Amino acid sequence: MRKALFAAIALVCLAIAIVPASTTRAAAPAATEWAANTTVIEACSCPMFCQCYFNTSPAGHHDHAGAAAHFCRANLAHRINKGHYGAVSLDGVKFWVASDLGGDFSGNPPKMDWAVLTFDKAMTKEQRDAVGEIMSHVFPVQWGSFTTAEGSIDVWEYTKDAARATLDGGKSGEVKLKRFQGMTNDPIVIKNLGYWGVPRHEGFVLMPNEVEAYRVGPKAFEFKGSNGFMITWDMSSKDLAPKPAPAKN
């Protein structure tokens, strides 16, 4: 994800990669092979374009008393276009991540406030387990709180000009985006900018939000006119650094 976050992730991956192999270690058991090509309808509370991609803290927000607080509260509505985890098909699976990155994610690993991963009701237990494992690699950070929930992602749609997703008909969550007008009628796309822990993506398609809301529990929030975009990323188990084999006794 963010610039500092990418650097921290890179250091962690490098440290794993350079651990010397030992002749006293047995071969590690084969991990489950997986792959996912996923499109995300995403929005957050930062002004357009989210400064978190270039800094170690989010934009400041002022309350009615004038006090400033830094946070990035976001909704990420995912749909796996094509994917699998071992023999488990993930084609068409939808899930939702609501989160707050907190005020400072300069650590290594980056520490962020909270996240809720909501599985669509149509998902099987095997699909939920698979998505949970894959997301741990997509979001390689330390959350202060990470929980799961279940809901109905009943709207997930987009065109060249707009995108919309709702959780429980909008009662639990909603993201509505509209394309920002560029020099032509084609979408504005930012490429070659890192996104969380994924190694490949097709670019940030800029679409400021008309609304982005998470309407569940004490951490509910709602913003209008702030950052939004769509992105399609691709990742597989082949992209992960191999884990060192356990030492023999």
Language-model region placement:
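Short amphipathic beta-strand and strand-loop transition segments with alternating hydrophobic
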Residues: P58, A98-G102, S152-E157
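Sec/Tat signal peptide C-region and signal peptidase I cleavage site
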Residues: I18-A30
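N-terminal segment immediately downstream of the Sec signal-peptide cleavage site
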Residues: A28-H84
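Positively charged n-region of N-terminal signal peptides that target proteins for export
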Residues: M1-A4
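Bacterial N-terminal signal peptides
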Residues: A7-V19
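Short acidic, gly/pro-rich beta-turn/loop elements at beta-sheet edges
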Residues: F54-T56, V88, Q127
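Mid-chain, structured segments of secreted extracytoplasmic proteins
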Residues: K82-A122
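Mature, soluble, non-transmembrane domains
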Residues: N108-K243, K248
